[in-house]
């Protein structure tokens, strides 16, 4: 069973279907012409071989052909309680557990001085800056795989800009965010990025690439460990209640579960790009807010970022994320 979307300027009708260069009968639901942007299901009674690659060619009534490579043939995903529980456990392991591990350093970090605070806040900026570039790159890559009618790259830029401006407006209400409010914005930005990670893992498992999915789980888990430290940094001089830490961990890591479900059951490149664009805009807003907080704390303006402790934190944050990202690049 295959989902087909019409991306051309005119309605189209599928006349014939080839699988591995052989013509096969098919059933289209709903039948008839496929209007621009619409989708239909094609059921082809072909003896699919689980795990094998197949080439599918659609021939329209005008003679135009469209070929798609099915890298791994797998059954069409169906929603079951057991499957949702399994994916939720993986999402928690990837998203929530590493965040909680990082937050556990909170008691140890509370004793740091101003230099240590500068380092940790700069570390946070470094982590988030890498996530910003990573989210934008993945969003544009997915946008390039979407149908032309979605205008993928333009959509990514507009959605990211709108998200950034909206969150900046919300964040500035009542003054620049500090303490727990700033930690909440950091957790939100990281959570939206983790939504994209969940999409990638879910899509890998849905495509039958269990090895790749397991590889991504382990890599993203290692990749996310320091994010908890970044979330805790703004509240080191405060004493937030325990429930606040639980909420921050769920906000930052919980979206990975949602991403797993969406990626395995209803993944499409345009919606993946849309979600990652929101994440990129949110992360950019957090980078700006944390940077402004560091400058206010040191009262040196842009010269603040020339301090050794801050330069060291920025470098350490970017370097750690870059090195651990190597475990999830294929």
Q: Model segments located where?
A:
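A broad structural signal for short, well-ordered beta-strand segments within beta-sheet-rich domains
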Residues: 1, 13-14, 53, 129
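Asparagine-centered strand-capping/turn motif at beta-strand->loop junctions
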Residues: 2-9
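Short, hydrophobic/aromatic beta-strand segments
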Residues: 10-18
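Short capping micro-motif at the N-terminus of alpha-helices
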Residues: 14, 26-27, 68
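Surface loops and adjacent helix of pleckstrin homology
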Residues: 17, 29, 132
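Solvent-exposed serine/threonine-rich low-complexity stretches and specific carbohydrate-binding patches
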Residues: 25-34
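Intrinsically disordered, metal-sensing/regulatory segments
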Residues: 33-43, 47-330
